[in-house]
Regions:
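Short, charged N-terminal beta->alpha structural module
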Residues: 2-31
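Active-site nucleotide/adenylate-binding loops and adjacent lid/helix of ATP-dependent enzymes
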Residues: 4-8, 74-76, 84-128
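Loop/helix-junction capping segments adjacent to catalytic residues or to phosphate/diphosphate-binding pockets
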Residues: 15-16, 62, 89, 119
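Short amphipathic alpha-helical segments and helix-helix/interface helices
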Residues: 22-26, 65-70, 96, 122-123
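N-terminal glycine-rich "phosphate-gripper" loop used for MgATP/nucleotide binding
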Residues: 34-74, 80-90
Length: 128
């Protein structure tokens, strides 16, 4: 049996769909013989009391979910939405490069820089 922390931001529980998902995660954990507790931002210091961490909030290297994931990883815990994945997925160009290297089929993609953000360039882009 594992003690699992589920990191949740309060804003993520304001939608009925999210609440349903959180309840379903807890039920699934119990059915598999595990204990799942919800952990909020104020509880980040308690994350190391658990065996594993599951992130169920918006992830970005600049928010609390990343701090929670990094804390758990540094303490050798299993983490779903680990810090490296958060960084890769938040950086779309980095993610694109990983997909290309792995030969994952993806739609034609073009990156545009700040200097290309004018009306004429956008019209031309969509006419190609």
């Amino acid at each position: 049996m594992a003690d699992i922390a589920c990191f949740v931001e309060r804003y993520t529980v304001s939608r009925a769909e999210e609440l349903t998902a959180l309840v379903n995660f807890k039920l699934a954990a119990h059915e598999l013989g595990h204990r799942l507790e919800y952990v909020f931002r104020k509880d980040i210091g308690k994350i190391t009391d658990y065996d594993a961490l599951f992130i169920r909030s918006l992830t970005d290297p600049l928010n609390a979910a990343y701090v929670a994931a990094r804390t758990a990883e540094l303490h050798g815990m299993k983490v779903i939405d680990d810090p490296d994945s958060i960084i890769i997925c938040c950086d779309k160009i980095n993610m694109y490069m990983h997909l290309m290297r792995a030969r994952v089929p993806i739609p034609d993609t073009r990156f545009i820089g700040k200097s290309e953000l004018d009306r004429q360039a956008m019209v031309q882009l969509f006419e190609e």
